[in-house]
From Swiss-Prot:
GO cellular component: cytoplasm
EC number: 3.6.4.13
Catalytic activity, reaction form: ATP + H2O = ADP + phosphate + H(+)
Record InterPro entries: DEAD/DEAH_box_helicase_dom (IPR011545), EIF4A_DEADc (IPR044728), Helicase_ATP-bd (IPR014001), Helicase_C-like (IPR001650), P-loop_NTPase (IPR027417), RNA-helicase_DEAD-box_CS (IPR000629), RNA_helicase_DEAD_Q_motif (IPR014014)
Binding-site residues, ATP: A66, Q67, S68, G69, T70, G71, K72, T73
Gene that specifies this protein: TIF1
Keyword Manganese: no
Record carries keyword Disulfide bond: no
GO molecular function: ATP binding; ATP hydrolysis activity; RNA binding; RNA helicase activity; translation initiation factor activity
Broadest EC class assigned to this enzyme: hydrolase
Entry domain remark: The Q motif is unique to and characteristic of the DEAD box family of RNA helicases and controls ATP binding and hydrolysis.
Protein name as it appears in the record: ATP-dependent RNA helicase eIF4A
Length: 396
């Protein structure tokens, strides 16, 4: 199994499909695809991959409840590449993601797996040139990874022809449906061939997701990770009661005086707070980057590049970053604000320990937040402990 994948106890997986495939060789994949899988670093399928790749290849609709770090991107990427007809130079697979960053990351994975195949993969995302999209869509791209707004626009303009689409994949469906994309996604469904296979992946199963499954999926295979396993293994969860909002900043600087951390991601709930915190930390000589949804795509790319290269030690973000960006060297995540949407908690703290490293998540809570934190514990069947005074030992 690749280092990037969290192992899951088999007893924590429920599936309505009884075949489990323990080896990529046993999936009877195209030779070129198999070479790409091993070249990418996958050794054996993760628990989700053992159960979901085959039914997707067989053309069944699949509903998989899986969070970041379980190998879900590999699951649908491998299945999509297996089913693509390389001779047909037209879009055959459509993958939707809630953010541009996640769409680009998925595109990178698909391209890496397809390195020995004759397959073109295009990212159809906001903030990029319409001309580029138009040329790629008319130039034989077979797998399109995109965000709902831009994909809908391209189909609506009749630039993206959907006649050959046979597979529609929705990644992070709970996030897409909760952030205003619902109407566009429903419209995209109506513009695809009625025979299209639907694969839906979601960390949680709120009503919006279940509504999509009942409206657009045909007798889907369901693969569900039990809710109490949705917190990623290896993440130590702690809280600090700062009592009042005004004491958060002092708590943060005290924390940095006590520990030695290579890099950290700090989450705030608003752009304004991201900007204020960034400014205060810079005044105190911290090397800080900030990222939020209003930034131009080019600016976001530059900021992420700086952070990944290590030239910035702290990345402050709104929930934009909480889904799908691999920041492998991060050992600490700080929720400066508890997330306003409890489904986002898992995505925020999942940043820390996804790649086999021990991760620490520290939540700053005011007296008013205690109830919300207890609700998070109930929702995820987990425990958030008070940060011990011997905090430096956590980072040894």
């Amino acid at each position: 199994m690749s280092d990037g994948i969290t192992d899951i106890d088999e007893n924590q997986i429920q599936s309505t499909y009884d075949k489990v495939v323990y080896s990529f060789d046993d999936l009877k994949l195209k030779e070129e695809l198999l070479r790409g899988i091993f070249g990418y670093g996958f050794v054996e399928p993760s628990a989700i991959q053992q159960r979901a790749i085959l039914p997707i290849i067989e053309g069944k609709d699949v509903l998989a409840q899986a969070q970041s770090g379980t190998g879900k991107t590999g699951t649908f990427s491998i299945a999509a590449l297996q089913n693509i007809d390389e001779k047909i130079k037209a879009p055959q697979g459509l993958i939707l993601a809630p953010t541009r960053e996640l769409a680009l990351q998925i595109q990178k994975v698909v391209m890496a797996l397809a390195i020995h195949m004759d397959v073109k993969v295009h990212a159809c995302i906001g903030g990029t040139s319409l001309q580029e999209d138009s040329e790629a869509l008319r130039g034989g791209a077979q797998i399109i990874v995109g965000t709902p707004g831009r994909v809908f626009d391209m189909i609506d303009r009749r630039i993206f022809k959907t006649d050959n689409i046979k597979m529609f994949i929705l990644d992070e469906a709970d996030e897409m449906l909760s952030t205003g994309f619902k109407e566009q996604i429903y419209n995209i469904f109506t513009m695809l061939p009625p025979t299209s296979q639907v694969v839906l992946l979601s960390a949680t199963m709120p009503g919006d997701v279940l509504e999509v499954t009942s409206k657009f999926m045909k007798d889907p295979v369901r693969i569900l990770v039990k809710k109490d396993e949705l917190t990623l293994e290896g993440i130590g969860q702690y809280y600090v009661n700062v009592e009042e909002e005004q004491y958060k900043y002092d708590c943060l600087t005290d924390l940095y005086d006590s520990i030695s951390v290579t890099q950290a991601v700090i989450f705030c709930n608003t752009r304004r707070k991201v900007e204020e915190l960034t400014e205060r930390l810079r005044e105190n000589n911290f090397t800080v980057s900030a990222i939020y949804s209003d930034l131009q795509q080019q600016e976001r790319d530059t900021i992420m590049k700086e952070f990944r290269s290590g030239s910035s030690r702290i990345l402050i973000s709104t929930d934009l970053l909480a889904r799908g960006i691999d920041v492998q060297q991060v050992s600490l995540v700080i929720n400066y604000d508890l997330p306003s949407n409890k489904e986002n908690y898992i995505h925020r703290i999942g940043r820390g320990g996804r790649f086999g490293r021990k991760g620490i998540a520290i939540n700053f809570v005011t007296n008013k937040d205690i109830g919300a934190m207890r609700e998070l514990e109930r929702f995820y069947s987990t425990q958030i402990e008070e940060l011990p005074s011997s905090i430096s030992e956590l980072f040894d």
